[in-house]
Amino acid sequence: MENQPKLNSSKEVIAFLAERFPHCFSAEGEARPLKIGIFQDLVDRVAGEMNLSKTQLRSALRLYTSSWRYLYGVKPGATRVDLDGNPCGELDEQHVEHARKQLEEAKARVQAQRAEQQAKKREAAAAAGEKEDAPRRERKPRPTTPRRKEGAERKPRAQKPVEKAPKTAKAPREEQHTPVSDISALTVGQALKVKAGQNAMDATVLEITKDGVRVQLNSGMSLIVRAEHLVF
């Protein structure tokens, strides 16, 4: 008994219990709910083995029953087992609800710890970015152009073609017209022009009336035009 190795951590104790009582404890996967009062059964069964103390057994049991995989196993309809895997009664609703709350709290703590770690990493990265500026690249010296030897013939520089300014198109000369001052001087068949805005259309006198002069345009259309719209 003196040469038995000593278990130093709660995880090592749990591994020992899973090997010693495989129908009760498990080292991985979903765990089965334990019998109420199983601590005393452990003390009676493993007293002196592996130099285990009551304190070690109690700490290992606390770690085992607070693990997520054990809390997942505490659910409605599950049955408690003793050290040999024998059923020891079904879980009551109070214990199931307590395990559910413990699991939710454990998950919340883990999420809070992860969020805090991420925040610290971001702060550290931001602080490092402010303190350390990116090193500037050194400018490479410009290559020196070799000097022209004395007496060497200088190459003529290529002359750039001179671009000629585009000629501005001359505005067409406006045709000068003489306004008709007296329509009584006009004769039938006389050629003249009818002003329409800035343009003047060719026309022929058909008739002289009291309202104006009836003319015929080159298009064949005839109309009466007043004197101020007629020019030669």
UniProtKB/Swiss-Prot annotation:
The keyword 4Fe-4S does not apply. InterPro entries: ProQ (IPR023529), ProQ/FinO (IPR016103), ProQ/FinO_sf (IPR036442), ProQ_C (IPR035236). One of its GO terms (molecular function) is RNA strand-exchange activity. Its main location: cytoplasm. Residues 137-146 have a biased composition (Basic residues). One of its GO terms (cellular component) is cytosol. It is found in: Cytoplasm. It comes from the Bacteria. Residues 117-136, 147-177 have a biased composition (Basic and acidic residues). Pfam families: ProQ, ProQ_C. Residues 105-182 are annotated as: Disordered. Belongs to the ProQ family. HAMAP family: ProQ. RNA chaperone with significant RNA binding, RNA strand exchange and RNA duplexing activities. May regulate ProP activity through an RNA-based, post-transcriptional mechanism. This is RNA chaperone ProQ. The gene is proQ.
